[in-house]
């Protein structure tokens, strides 16, 4: 048993060393993107991707994003998400991707028009403390890879779907659109 374990370990290490001798693709990526709840609520997203494999056709990744968007006369939403997914790369340069994840949203309601009634019956303006949400994230995307000798530059479009909880005691779905540039490097 011990001998077969040593042989198996040797084969696994040998195959991983042989696999890593080729020219590996990008191992990391960063993006900067427009993030908006539709086109009228503009925002910004910055993210980091770590590629977990070296397959040129299928990339498995984990991604962390921070971002915000501004809804005029309503709220500012700040967010952090962690996602994992895969990307199918075609030889033409086109790619399709999908991912799932979780995150944290902090929505700060704008202060104009928020009022409360005091214990003595007078009405006073109330400051905004904001609301927190736990979203589950699902997204799909498409883009195109432009390859250079040292990096890969990829414009992309990614609709994001969020299921926020709690939201008035029930889950609520929201969609944003992300359009940006992904810069992948070794």
Give residue spans per PLM region.
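Bacterial Sec-dependent N-terminal signal peptides
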Residues: 1-26, 185
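Short glycine/proline- and aromatic-enriched beta-strand/turn motifs that initiate or cap beta-hairpins
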Residues: 20-69, 184-186
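Histidine- and/or cysteine-centered catalytic micro-motif in compact active-site loops
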Residues: 3, 65-67, 101-103
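Outer-membrane beta-barrel transmembrane domain signature
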Residues: 85-186
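Transmembrane beta-barrel strand/turn architecture of Gram-negative outer membrane proteins
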Residues: 63-66, 77-89
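Sequence/structural signature of outer-membrane beta-barrel proteins
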Residues: 35, 39, 51, 55, ...
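Residues that define the transmembrane beta-barrel architecture of outer-membrane proteins
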Residues: 26-28, 40-44, 58-60, 76-80, ...
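Short coil turns and loop connectors of transmembrane beta-barrels in diderm outer membranes
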Residues: 3, 26, 54-58, 90-94, ...
